[in-house]
Regions:
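Short glycine-rich or small-residue beta-strand-to-loop segments that form or flank ligand, phosphate
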Residues: 85-92
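Conserved "HGTGT" condensation-loop signature of ketosynthase/thiolase-family condensing enzymes
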Residues: 1-85, 109
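Cofactor-binding loop segments of dinucleotide-utilizing enzymes, especially the Rossmann-like FAD-
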Residues: 19-21, 92, 154
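Acyl-thioester C-C bond-transforming condensing/cleaving domain
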Residues: 2-8, 75-81, 95-169
Length: 169
């Protein structure tokens, strides 16, 4: 007689408790981009599906955008910064080797004393971060009075964009 396997979905003890986001305020449409490059709105839409994109201004630093998103997630979860045991930031656009973006965010959200590190793995970085966060919670690497991990995916590609080059604009 077959025996039914009983499994849980996900790992016990690890779950998403808050979500936050930040998008730059400036909305740029294809017509504005096309004024700088040899292209058309139709060409861009057909090949990429892009109609608008967000460009960060000088006040919208990578640290500010990541910290704002983290603050919103903490607020939604009802968690304070001093309860955060680790901050993981997935990014490829942080232009400084040190301090890490995660260390800067840790300070901004009031989580000083917790672990902090960046993950540089392009598009997969955030997924790796979520997996590592779940492992940290389940293994007890974070816990006690700091049981939470904040995972952030943040990019500021405006700094790396050549606005006159069709392949990056």
């Amino acid at each position: 007689m077959p025996t039914a396997l009983r499994t849980t979905v996900g790992a016990p003890g690890a779950r998403l408790v808050g979500l936050g986001s930040y998008r730059p305020t400036r909305i740029v449409d294809n017509d504005e981009v096309c004024r700088r490059i040899d292209s058309t709105d139709e060409w861009i839409r057909t090949r990429s599906g892009i109609v608008t994109r967000r460009w960060a201004d000088d006040s919208e630093t990578l640290t500010m955008m990541a910290s704002t998103a983290a603050g919103k997630a903490l607020s939604e979860a009802g968690v304070s910064g001093d309860q955060v045991g680790c901050v993981l930031v997935a990014t490829v656009s942080h232009l400084l080797q040190t301090p890490s973006l995660a260390a800067s965010v840790t300070h901004e959200i009031g989580a000083d004393g917790g672990a902090a590190f960046d993950i540089s793995a392009a598009c997969a970085g955030f997924v790796y971060g979520v997996s590592m966060a779940a492992d940290m919670v389940r293994s007890g690497s974070v816990g006690g009075d700091r049981p939470y991990v904040v995972v952030i995916g943040a990019e500021r590609l405006t700094d790396m964009t050549d606005f006159t080059d069709r392949s990056t604009a």
